[in-house]
């Protein structure tokens, strides 16, 4: 039975994180920025699971941390979308550049 090396998991996680970081820094649509942040969190989850499974003492700690991170990411997405809906009702736009003032 062949096993996937740890470097493959880490390379995939780095690629996912870089794609998410690039999207979060360059895109102007707030929904896309939230999706890119979720992609970065998933890359971190992949690292947690890979190190847990392929480490010196394999155990379930990485999987448990990954599940906890997914719960936090779901809450973050819900709060982010709620804020986005409130801003859209107030400003009628979801562009990041348009949201530069606090009131008015």
Swiss-Prot record:
UniProt xrefs under InterPro entries: NADH_UbQ_OxRdtase_chain4L/K, NUOK/Mnh_C1-like
Cellular compartment(s): Cell membrane
Translocase among keywords: yes
EC number(s) per entry: 7.1.1.-
Keywords linked to the UniProt accession: Cell membrane, Membrane, NAD, Quinone, Translocase, Transmembrane, Transmembrane helix, Transport
GO molecular function: NADH:ubiquinone reductase (non-electrogenic) activity; quinone binding
Main location: membrane
Membrane topology: Multi-pass membrane protein
Coiled-coil annotated residue ranges, if any: none
Catalysis: reaction(s): a quinone + NADH + 5 H(+)(in) = a quinol + NAD(+) + 4 H(+)(out)
Residues annotated as transmembrane: 4-24, 31-51, 67-87
GO cellular component, as recorded: NADH dehydrogenase complex; plasma membrane
Keyword Transmembrane helix: yes
UniProt GO BP: ATP synthesis coupled electron transport
Family: Belongs to the complex I subunit 4L family.
Function of the protein: NDH-1 shuttles electrons from NADH, via FMN and iron-sulfur (Fe-S) centers, to quinones in the respiratory chain. The immediate electron acceptor for the enzyme in this species is believed to be a menaquinone. Couples the redox reaction to proton translocation (for every two electrons transferred, four hydrogen ions are translocated across the cytoplasmic membrane), and thus conserves the redox energy in a proton gradient.
Subunit architecture: NDH-1 is composed of 14 different subunits. Subunits NuoA, H, J, K, L, M, N constitute the membrane sector of the complex.
Protein name per UniProt: NADH-quinone oxidoreductase subunit K
Originating species: Bacillus cereus (strain B4264)
């Amino acid at each position: 039975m062949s096993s996937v090396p740890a470097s493959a998991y880490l390379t995939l996680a780095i690629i996912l994180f870089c794609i998410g970081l690039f999207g979060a820094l360059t895109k102007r649509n707030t929904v896309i920025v939230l999706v890119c942040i979720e992609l970065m969190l998933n890359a971190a989850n992949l690292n947690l699971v890979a190190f847990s499974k392929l480490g010196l003492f394999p155990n379930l700690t990485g999987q448990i941390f990954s599940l906890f991170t997914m719960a936090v990411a779901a809450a973050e997405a819900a709060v982010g979308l709620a804020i986005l809906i409130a801003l859209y009702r107030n400003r009628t736009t979801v562009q990041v550049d348009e949201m530069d003032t606090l009131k008015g």
